[in-house]
């Protein structure tokens, strides 16, 4: 019986080792049904309105308007090789900056191209400032974790996260913008 168990285990291992890479060449699915993941870049743009339709923070003192772009990565190491492949929409955001490192933040992503064209995702949460002196003093690095509260028909909920650079003094060498990952769950594909 032990010999049969070992033979069966070896057969399963062989199928996994040899069929796994072959099956992966077609690529794994992009997610479960009803799951939509977007990865894109935002860059502050004075030509885009910085006033979201709704801002839930009385006394908000941060307003940002940005263009949204798809990105291209190197498949071998996932390094970003093009931060602005195609314009995919715009964003308007507001926040409430105080002396605390946690900034309440609200954003409306208006997508106008691709599968999600004509759809606006709305997200709210907070951004955590982690540095205000890299790559130089006056530039803030932050990460945002936001709950996506509005989306397309059949929208159930989601999350939007960012790696963000804020350059309020408009210092040379860094623009205000973010790399975003947005995951939305819907009742439909």
What are these regions (language model features)?
Residues 20-24:
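Sec/Tat signal peptide C-region and signal peptidase I cleavage site
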Residues 1-9:
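Bacterial N-terminal signal peptides that target proteins for export
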Residues 8-19:
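Bacterial N-terminal signal peptides
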Residues 2, 16, 26-27:
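Short, low-complexity disordered leader/linker segments with a strong preference
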Residues 25-189:
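Beta-strand-enriched cores of mature, soluble protein domains
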């Amino acid at each position: 019986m032990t010999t049969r168990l070992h033979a069966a285990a070896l057969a399963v291992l062989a199928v996994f080792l040899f069929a796994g890479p072959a099956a992966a060449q077609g690529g794994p699915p992009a997610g479960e049904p009803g799951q939509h993941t977007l990865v894109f870049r935002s860059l502050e743009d004075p030509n885009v309105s910085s006033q979201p339709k709704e801002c839930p923070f009385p006394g908000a003192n941060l307003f940002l308007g940005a263009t949204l772009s798809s990105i291209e990565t190197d498949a071998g190491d996932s390094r970003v090789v093009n931060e602005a492949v195609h314009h995919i929409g715009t964003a308007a955001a507001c926040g409430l900056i105080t002396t605390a490192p946690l900034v309440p933040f609200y954003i409306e992503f208006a997508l106008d191209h691709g599968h999600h064209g004509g759809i606006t995702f709305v997200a709210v949460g907070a951004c955590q400032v982690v540095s205000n002196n890299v790559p130089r003093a006056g530039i803030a690095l932050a990460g945002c974790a936001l709950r996506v509260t509005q989306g397309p028909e059949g929208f159930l909920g989601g999350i939007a996260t960012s790696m963000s650079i804020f350059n309020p003094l408009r210092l040379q060498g860094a623009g205000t913008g973010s790399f975003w990952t947005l995951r939305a769950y819907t009742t439909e594909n």
